Amino acid sequence: MSVYSIRRIMLESYPILFICVLIGLFAGGTLEKSLTGIKGTLVIMMVPLLNGIGGNLGCILGARLGSALHLGTVEPRLKGRVLRKNVHASVLTSIGIFLFISVIFFVIACMWGMGFVMAAKHALAFILAGMLLTPVIVVSVVTLAFLSFQKGLDPDNVVIPIATSIIDVAAAISLLIVAITIVGL
Amino acid sequence: MDVRSVVIQGLAILIICTFIELGAGFMLKGMEERFMLIPGLAIMTLPLLDLRGNINGALASRLGTALHTGVISPRLKLTAELTANLSASLILSLITSATIGVLSWLMGSMMGLPVNILQLMVIAVIAGFISGLVLALLTVLVAVFTYLRGWDPDNITSPAMSTIGDLMTVTCIYLAVLLVG
């Protein structure tokens, strides 16, 4: 008798993946609509960075909260020192990494032959989008972790796929809105 | 827990991920013209990226648990348990990629774009399956390697794999687009 069955893995995974695809299509649709607007800029290059790194930040917080809920060091309520410290660490990490990436985009834009103002606008767009995304990451991961734990589901299986899909949509939308409307790339 | 050490560890792994994601970014920038030529391609790129991370993230986390509980031993042998895990991941890749193809066509039609269902399906399935195959094998290697090294899969394996997955997926989408024309 084997522990893993193909049938069971598929039946448990496909519904969640399907929900993720539905959420992800909104991110894709937004990108498709903005293609002409971002032509000639480096915004499309920023998409995997904001989505990927944002997703990674969510994964790390989700995995940490999942373990803490199982261990009992965090209770599914919005208070307590361990929860506050975890959120604090995530916000600091996100500010640090998004600042680092915006500096990289400043350098890439300069090397691409764009002027100082255009390069600075690229950096500004990335950091603004990152700062808009950070609360979405924290709120969605904490909410999903608590809800799934209260419902008796394993946060490890539910939180990360759904949170990364939500983060993808939020990242693509905030990046495109910031880049086109606010910074005017 | 110590906030400082969590931030430092997180930043270290994320800086490495940043450079890999930049590769994916350059690839997308290089595909910009193709996005204009193939309506609907941009729609499915993001769900395909997301899918890769989700399937391999789940595979990595199941393998991590299986290694810790001794169900799978840290050797590269195709046992029944490992085969079931790998096959399930590959079948899921295939079925979900096809789902993405159909739904992107539907979404594109609703947005009033001149989308071609056959073209989108072929690109989605080829890109999803090739990247799924490469990533599944890589996930097994990385899971066994990190387990033998004693690294924490929560903090290192998952972010690293999802980032490598992004780069592989964008590469495979580009290959599929070149193949379809």
What are the roles of these predicted feature ranges?
Chain A
Residues 136-150:
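Transmembrane alpha-helical segments of integral membrane proteins
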